[in-house]
A protein has these predicted regions:
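An N-terminal domain-cap segment
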Residues: 1-35, 43
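Well-ordered beta-strand positions in beta-sheet-rich domains
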Residues: 7-9, 58-62, 117
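Short small/polar-residue motifs
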Residues: 8-10, 83, 160-165
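A generic structural motif
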Residues: 13-16, 69, 107, 170
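Coil-to-beta-strand transition motifs
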Residues: 16-20, 56-58, 180
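Short, structured beta-strand-loop surface elements
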Residues: 29-89, 93-96, 103-106
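C-terminal edge-of-domain segments
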Residues: 89-181
Length: 181
């Protein structure tokens, strides 16, 4: 289907700067397409129980996917394992690589009639001052403020877990690990 875009479904992780990172096999159709033409549109959507699916929020990121330098491979494998434990079986296969999208345009739809283009300069943050201290931030939060993590998880996602722990910080907040989800 040369010259035609090809939609696909793939899991992803986000980089600290909000960049999208996928882990894909060289045999996959979407990897072949990335190598032939890196221009891509990556849509993230929220699935809710609303009757009118047009009321669901979604965002389309437009940009180019490029293979990530192998120097980051172990870091990204750990991150993928933490966020998507089901990916473990793929992590040691030799034909899988990480690809990161360089985002050029962002289309946000918050529901029917709530539509707009976002400025990618406002979306991406290349100067992450706290990055060298991420481990210390996480350790401090887990040791001294675990009640806040547990309360936030309960309030935002209705997940009750007294053992919830912060696992990663990003420019939007943080990720938690929970025994209950």
């Amino acid at each position: 289907f040369e010259g035609y875009p090809f939609g696909s479904f793939i899991t992803y992780i986000t980089d600290r700067d909000r960049g999208i990172i996928i882990f894909a096999s060289n045999l996959a159709e979407h990897t072949t397409n990335i190598k032939n033409n890196s221009k891509s549109c990556f849509t993230i959507f929220s699935i809710t129980d609303t009757e009118n699916k047009q009321d669901n929020a979604r965002m389309s990121l437009i940009g180019d996917f490029n293979q990530v330098d192998n120097k980051r491979r172990e870091e990204l494998k750990t991150k993928l394992r933490n966020h998507l434990p089901e990916s473990e079986m793929y992590l040691n296969l030799g034909d899988f690589n990480f690809y990161k999208m360089s985002i050029t345009n962002i289309r946000w739809i918050g529901g029917f009639g709530k539509i707009g283009w976002l400025n990618n300069k406002d979306w991406l943050n290349k100067n992450i001052e706290w990055e060298p201290a991420e481990k210390e931030i996480i350790d401090h939060m887990n040791q001294d403020h675990s009640n806040s993590i547990i309360s936030t998880l309960s309030a935002q996602h209705n997940i009750k877990d007294k053992n919830a722990k912060m696992t990663e910080v990003n420019i939007d907040g943080y990720y938690c690990q929970s025994d209950n989800k």
